[in-house]
Amino acid sequence: MSFRDDNEEARNDLRRPFIHTGSWYRMGSRQSSMMGSSQVIRDSSISVLACVLIVALGPIQFGFTCGYSSPTQAAITKDLGLTVSEYSVFGSLSNVGAMVGAIASGQIAEYIGRKGSLMIAAIPNIIGWLCISFAKDTSFLYMGRLLEGFGVGIISYTVPVYIAEIAPQNMRGGLGSVNQLSVTIGIMLAYLLGLFVPWRILAVLGILPCTLLIPGLFFIPESPRWLAKMGMTDEFETSLQVLRGFETDITVEVNEIKRSVASSTKRNTVRFVDLKRRRYYFPLMVGIGLLVLQQLGGINGVLFYSSTIFESAGVTSSNAATFGVGAIQVVATAISTWLVDKAGRRLLLTISSVGMTISLVIVAAAFYLKEFVSPDSDMYSWLSILSVVGVVAMVVFFSLGMGPIPWLIMSEILPVNIKGLAGSIATLANWFFSWLITMTANLLLAWSSGGTFTLYGLVCAFTVVFVTLWVPETKGKTLEELQSLFR
């Protein structure tokens, strides 16, 4: 290659947005023929896994935000003189911010790319944690929580979509489940660190995931499908080549993606009346339905009440018990990550929903029977233990399917030309019902503990029906093949 050719290619690189192209993988593509690619670069699974591990810092931030308010409640209310209602507002503001972030997430990811979207999400997260760390009153505390929620709302849509768009079909399920696995790791870390460090230091530690994410984004390729949709053909093929390995023939996959993009751009403008067509309404219904049912199954209500259940069973340290539940979530989600490309999405969703239904029936029955048993009797103690078993089982079954898979399926089945709008709607619905369950849990539990868990159990039973009748199996299919299923 001549010096002039090198200069020309360098000038072309400078014209392109750095956040979209990165630098190392273009250099690797040019030099691989001269130097020979290393096994690490040549192996597509390693390349894709490295990208997934970097963007997984986003969901870790997501989980850390969710878990932060639990171990810090006593210290924050004491140091800042907050009432219980003021702290409840603090806890719920992340959901409010996430709803706003969810509304914007799809359009941001469509206009500036998946990587640019994650960059935007990281900045308010960092500012939010700093606001909380230096808060002297509720104003900075609330502002920080809102900013965190906004960033998390964008992350919750963008990360599963990015992973689905870069992963090969035989690894997409497992890699897609890393999203929820990272969320549970973030929650567990917040619980664990909250046992040992003050709340202000814990907020400073919350900055780390996004602080590492920002530079990491410059070392991974942009989603090839987004680049293809935007007409950036050279970058699209370079990105895909890096993800599949420099010595892999990507001709077939390139042609499939080009055909899919060409087909979708013919119908680039989608009106609400067009959503009546099966190719749009069916995947939209499935994506929104699963994300709504994920929340209506009551996981947030169960986790919210878990410390009280543990105390009634004689567990002395509710914070330690909460950390134990967080650790169980991580293990169960890791098992799901390993199984999802082997067993399939539908089977895991069905097992998860059936298991959650049975677990919630056990918890509800324990609470109903407690009303007829003396608190001093052995039977009352056994019923308390039974309720703990039911809660733990519910968390395990949720983590096996209904935790990770709705996000995975949403990212897989939404058509390219409505993914931004439809993904925003689905993410907004998930966050809205998360907020609704959190806000109503206390009221429902005050009305009837047994009745509350019965309602959650009925929703989980309906989820079994929903999965059986309407959720398609996406295992082993390319994203382009999935689009053709709905035509």
From Swiss-Prot:
Signal sequence coordinates: none
GO molecular function: sugar transmembrane transporter activity
Alphabetical UniProt keywords: Acetylation, Membrane, Sugar transport, Transmembrane, Transmembrane helix, Transport
GO terms under cellular component: Golgi apparatus; mitochondrion; plant-type vacuole; plant-type vacuole membrane
Function statement: Sugar transporter.
Residue ranges of coiled coil: none
InterPro entries, per database record: MFS_dom, MFS_ERD6/Tret1-like, MFS_sugar_transport-like, MFS_trans_sf, MFS_Trehalose_Transporter, Sugar/inositol_transpt, Sugar_transporter_CS
GO terms for biological process, alphabetical: glucose homeostasis; positive regulation of seed germination
Family to which the UniProt record says this protein belongs: Belongs to the major facilitator superfamily. Sugar transporter (TC 2.A.1.1) family.
UniProt topology in membrane: Multi-pass membrane protein
Compartment(s) of residence: Membrane
Provenance organism: Arabidopsis thaliana
UniProt name for this protein: Sugar transporter ERD6-like 6
Source taxon at top rank: Eukaryota
